[in-house]
Amino acid sequence: MHILIGGGSGFVGSALTARFRARGDKVTWVSRAPGPDRISWLDVAAGRVPECDVVINLAGEHILNLRRRWNDEYRRDLVRSRVGTTSSLVNALNAMAKPPAVFISTAGKCFYGTAEVAADTRYPELDEYSRPMAMDFPASMVALWEDAANAIDTARIRHVHVRLGIILGAVERVSLLAKLWRIGRGRGILPLIRLPFCLGLGAVMGHGRQPMPWIHIDDVVGLFEHLVDARASRGRYNAVAPGIVSNREFTELLASRLHRPITWAAPASLVRAVVGEDRASILLDGQNVKPRRTLESGYFFRYPELQGALQDLVQITI
């Protein structure tokens, strides 16, 4: 097959590319940077999309890019990098005489919004059939993103929509400067937080009860491969592991894996001051997201529980 990936040079795109090429598929990226086996977003806007079997769109600026200040300009860039690229790609695919068989669009678990939950109340379960709890900025952005993708011609193209949770990738043993350079560069959350944990500075975020819908990068790749090959799959699928944990549980399991203590909790006010109000909601206000349709589709998670995922991804030595 020929697979076109928008945003292929990112964390998820690189992992998907390696997997599809390993099984003999041809992969082309839509990218801002020139290079072999790539086309540009200008090519897409002009309708110069090569004939292909599958299109996967991952493009979008990282919302946790801590090198960017949280302001109106950054919020506009977040929306434009998602909605603009998706609309351009959808328009190009709809205009093709021979369109791809399947279009996989992506968004985030932020679709479900956030809501205040009392200390003695469980967070409501949210699956692919659930409506957003509230429309904060991340939820509004994702709604616009999904609306742009939903303009695809479903009479000719099978549309699969994946909502990604917090992606966990392998932690590489690199220098401190390299770690700092990669902050916000979309390599998953573990490389970002491992250093403070190793220094004994790992912390629970706020009250720590908020759910953290996570997924191992291998399961992200496995699910995309499954949805490409499963021709009956259509509609929304949550890319989150069945074994969801709270922020406190996540923090304690990671600290235990690294043989480090948890000595403090980061106050919500401090988190908001550092990363911005809307961005802080991603860390402080969780969503209890379940992969209902994902499991019903027949996908089998390699890493359904966090402990096994951390054992695979996190080296104990600093």
Feature-to-residue mapping (PLM):
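C-terminal amphipathic/interface module of NAD(P)-dependent oxidoreductases
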Residues: 281-318
